[in-house]
Amino acid sequence: MGASRLYTLVLVLQPQRVLLGMKKRGFGAGRWNGFGGKVQEGETIEDGARRELQEESGLTVDALHKVGQIVFEFVGEPELMDVHVFCTDSIQGTPVESDEMRPCWFQLDQIPFKDMWPDDSYWFPLLLQKKKFHGYFKFQGQDTILDYTLREVDTV
């Protein structure tokens, strides 16, 4: 395993629904996902999360709550992805489509796991139960999980 790069992922959760975005281009295109991306140099992880949410959905947030950290390894890729997962229920604005993402609300019992990253079905239930977690997923390509660990933690 080599060096890692910081990424963010923000899930907008309301009592009966979650906001996901259909990735329109680039890494993960064609999948529903939360909003996020690379943390830029000189930016805190939380600032990066806020920026990515605003760029990809038009939303601004009052408060972000860090709920998880997942390290992804993709066979053949030199860098690990160190993804910091946040959730929020306090948003301002209306979700709007961007060049990268098409936002859509989903009822919590209708989350489209078959059209999401395969690892989401492992950790999303913890997120919905307001539990904090650490995870590691090793992928072959973008569809096959070769190995993983996932555990609940008290603090992220």
Curated annotation (Swiss-Prot):
Impact upon substituting E56A: Loss of ability to prevent DNA damage. Expected to cause loss of enzyme activity
Effect upon mutating E55G: Loss of activity
Binding site for 8-oxo-ATP: F27, F35, G36, G37, K38, E52, E56, W117, P118, D119, D120
Residues annotated to bind O(6)-methyl-dGMP: T8, K23, N33, W117, P118, D119, D120
Consequence when changing S57R: Loss of activity
Positions of 8-oxo-dGTP binding: T8, K23, N33, F35, G36, G37, K38, W117, P118, D119, D120
Residues the record lists as binding 8-oxo-dGMP: T8, K23, N33, W117, P118, D119, D120
Tissue distribution: Widely expressed with highest expression in thymus, testis, embryo and proliferating blood lymphocytes.
GO biological processes: DNA protection; DNA repair; purine nucleoside catabolic process; response to oxidative stress
Residues binding 2-oxo-dATP, per UniProt: T8, N33, F35, G36, G37, K38, W117, P118, D119, D120
Consequence of substituting G36R: Reduces activity by 97%
Residues reported in the UniProt entry to bind Mg(2+) 1: G36, E56, E100
Domain of life: Eukaryota
Result when mutating V153A: Reduces 2-oxo-dATPase and 8-oxo-dGTPase activities and increases thermolability
Note describing how the cofactor binds: Binds 2 Mg(2+) ion per subunit.
Pfam families listed in its UniProt record: NUDIX
Catalytic activity: 2-oxo-dATP + H2O = 2-oxo-dAMP + diphosphate + H(+); 2-oxo-ATP + H2O = 2-oxo-AMP + diphosphate + H(+); 8-oxo-dGTP + H2O = 8-oxo-dGMP + diphosphate + H(+); 8-oxo-dATP + H2O = 8-oxo-dAMP + diphosphate + H(+)
GO cellular component, one term: nucleus
Annotated SUPFAM superfamilies: Nudix (SSF55811)
UniProt record similarity statement: Belongs to the Nudix hydrolase family.
Name of the molecule in the record: Oxidized purine nucleoside triphosphate hydrolase
Organism: Homo sapiens
